[in-house]
């Protein structure tokens, strides 16, 4: 059995949240010098559940069937709480995205994580 495939979607999202945060920070720092407070404000534009949820529909067409399955499992996961800053559907979509990133990271597929991150940033910056 595949250990990673058997993890709960919420466990995958827990890891994926950290992976995504790191990717966003590296992306922003890579743009050039900025003050930490500016970087933090800019990072919020990417990491908020509403921002993550906006890119998921467009991202889906680039996913493999296995990745779409992980995304679906993440979307259907039911955490014990929902944040007040996002609608339930947005939060579930952001959990789905984080589940996918966590899954790929734990599978050791960093190249795919970076490929999807590049696409996510491109989609996010179109808004």
UniProtKB/Swiss-Prot annotation:
Nuclease listed as a keyword? yes
Tell me where in or outside the cell this protein is found.
Answer: Cytoplasm
Q: Which cofactor does it need?
A: Mg(2+)
Q: Which Pfam families match?
A: Ribonuclease_3
Q: Does the keyword Thylakoid apply?
A: no
EC number(s)? 3.1.26.-
Per the record, its GO cellular-component terms are: cytoplasm
What GO MF terms are annotated? ribonuclease III activity; rRNA binding
Question: Per its UniProt record, what SUPFAM superfamilies does this chain match?
Answer: RNase III domain-like
The protein's predominant localisation is cytoplasm
Top-rank lineage group of the source organism: Bacteria
Record keywords: Cytoplasm, Endonuclease, Hydrolase, Magnesium, Nuclease, Ribosome biogenesis, RNA-binding, rRNA processing, rRNA-binding
Any GO BP? rRNA processing
Q: What class of enzyme is it?
A: hydrolase
What does the record give as the active site? 17
Family recorded in the similarity comment: Belongs to the MrnC RNase family.
Subunit structure and binding partners: Homodimer.
| Job description of the protein | Involved in correct processing of both the 5' and 3' ends of 23S rRNA precursor. Processes 30S rRNA precursor transcript even in absence of ribonuclease 3 (Rnc); Rnc processes 30S rRNA into smaller rRNA precursors.
Looking up HAMAP family in the UniProt record yields: RNase_Mini_III (MF_01468)
Protein name, UniProt field:
Mini-ribonuclease 3
Species whose genome carries this gene: Moorella thermoacetica (strain ATCC 39073 / JCM 9320)
């Amino acid at each position: 059995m595949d250990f990673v495939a058997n993890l709960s979607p919420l466990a995958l999202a827990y890891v994926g949240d950290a992976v995504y945060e790191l990717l966003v920070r590296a992306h922003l720092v890579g743009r050039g010098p900025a003050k930490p407070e500016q970087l933090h404000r800019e990072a919020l534009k990417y990491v908020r559940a509403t921002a993550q949820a906006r890119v998921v529909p467009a991202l889906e067409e680039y996913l493999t069937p296995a990745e779409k399955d992980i995304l679906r499992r993440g979307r259907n996961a039911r955490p014990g709480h929902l944040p007040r800053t996002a609608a339930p559907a947005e939060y579930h979509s952001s959990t789905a995205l984080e589940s996918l990133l966590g899954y790929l990271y734990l599978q050791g597929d960093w190249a795919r994580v970076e490929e999807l991150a590049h696409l996510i940033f491109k989609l996010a910056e179109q808004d």
